[in-house]
């Protein structure tokens, strides 16, 4: 038996950094996906084949007394711990710890870009392996298992990434609580700088600045929280699409300015943001921790022009849209 599952990437639409201080955030799944095939093997080992994960590939086998590294190329290795923990967690849930499982991974999501590649591969792996082992799980349950994987690997996790990847669409998050929001099409372009910042270091930097100048930083964080609530109000409204796009674009630009004030933008991120706006995007901002990684632009009827502008500015564009679906079982071969 073989099972193919897929799970989407995510972007933080609004509220990164301020969410650390109890403010809300809105995230959404996007149509860049990680695909995982799962099947049994006779060796009793966990075997991971990652031949196309937007960095050079690798194949590694784990068993009780041996590890086989056929190749190892930098960031691709980061995938291994998430996949292995996901498989072990599902085998434990299904009470089938001894079964050998091979997973094969392909992905459209660049690793280390702040688009939730680790959560997507964990969620897709859980989806494929749970079906293979006959474990019936809802997408919400799979999202919770994905959160457990992140806690095991990272030691800390809000759960935003695996929840969005499992459920899809828009998610409002505040103080540990998730609320799905109504779906609407958002024609966006993601721009990747080609480098990544350390979320841990950037969060610590903002914290230090807040401790040094609370009277300045607190109002910025408060404003960011209000941006999120205004965006939620727009997503819940029955305004015509054109007006919703325009207002969301304005909020994106405001949110980017506030993030820049916190010091988490970079020259390259700003170049991509302003190139997108000049090319006709209604709004453009950092998504994620900053310091590198990605920005995104809202570009109805201008996606090609914005993508070209991002390329000229030295970024890697990805034309995409919001994914209504989260985890999908794509194929089951008996």
Curated annotation (Swiss-Prot):
The gene is mvk. Its main location: cytoplasm. Pathway: Isoprenoid biosynthesis; isopentenyl diphosphate biosynthesis via mevalonate pathway; isopentenyl diphosphate from (R)-mevalonate: step 1/3. NCBIfam families: mevalon_kin (TIGR00549), PRK03926.1 (NF003036). It comes from Thermococcus gammatolerans (strain DSM 15229 / JCM 11827 / EJ3). Keywords: ATP-binding, Cytoplasm, Isoprene biosynthesis, Kinase, Lipid biosynthesis, Lipid metabolism, Magnesium, Nucleotide-binding, Transferase. This is Mevalonate kinase. It is found in: Cytoplasm. The lineage of its organism: Archaea, Methanobacteriati, Methanobacteriota, Thermococci, Thermococcales. Its cofactor is Mg(2+).
């Amino acid at each position: 038996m073989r099972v193919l599952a897929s799970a989407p990437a995510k972007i933080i639409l609004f509220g990164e950094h301020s969410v650390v201080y109890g403010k809300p955030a809105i995230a959404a799944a996007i149509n860049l996906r990680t695909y995982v095939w799962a099947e049994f093997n006779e060796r009793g080992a966990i075997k991971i084949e990652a031949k196309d994960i937007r960095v050079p590939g690798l194949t590694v086998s784990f068993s009780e007394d041996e590890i086989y590294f056929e190749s190892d190329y930098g960031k691709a290795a980061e995938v291994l711990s998430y996949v292995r923990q996901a498989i072990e967690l599902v085998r434990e849930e299904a009470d089938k710890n001894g079964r050998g499982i091979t997973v094969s991974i392909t992905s459209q999501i660049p690793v280390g870009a702040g688009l939730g590649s680790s959560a997507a591969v964990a969620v897709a792996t859980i989806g494929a392996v749970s079906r293979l082992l006959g474990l019936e799980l809802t997408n919400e349950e799979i999202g919770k298992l994905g959160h457990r994987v992140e806690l095991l690997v990272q030691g800390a996790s809000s759960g935003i990434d695996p929840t969005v990847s499992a459920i899809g669409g828009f998610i409002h998050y505040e103080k540990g609580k998730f609320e799905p929001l109504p779906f609407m099409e958002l024609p966006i372009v993601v721009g990747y700088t080609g480098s990544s910042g350390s979320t841990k270091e950037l969060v610590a930097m903002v914290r230090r600045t807040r401790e040094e100048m609370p009277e300045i930083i607190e109002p910025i964080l408060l404003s960011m929280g209000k941006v999120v609530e205004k965006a939620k109000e727009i997503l819940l409204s029955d305004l015509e699409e054109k007006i919703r796009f325009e207002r969301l674009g304005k909020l994106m630009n405001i949110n980017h300015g506030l993030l820049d004030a916190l010091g988490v933008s970079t020259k390259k991120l700003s170049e991509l943001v302003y190139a997108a706006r000049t090319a006709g995007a209604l709004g453009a901002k950092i998504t994620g921790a900053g310091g590198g990684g990605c920005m995104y632009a809202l570009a109805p009827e201008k996606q090609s022009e914005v993508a070209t502008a991002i390329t000229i500015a030295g970024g890697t564009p990805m034309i995409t849209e919001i994914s209504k679906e989260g985890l999908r079982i794509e194929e089951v071969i008996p």
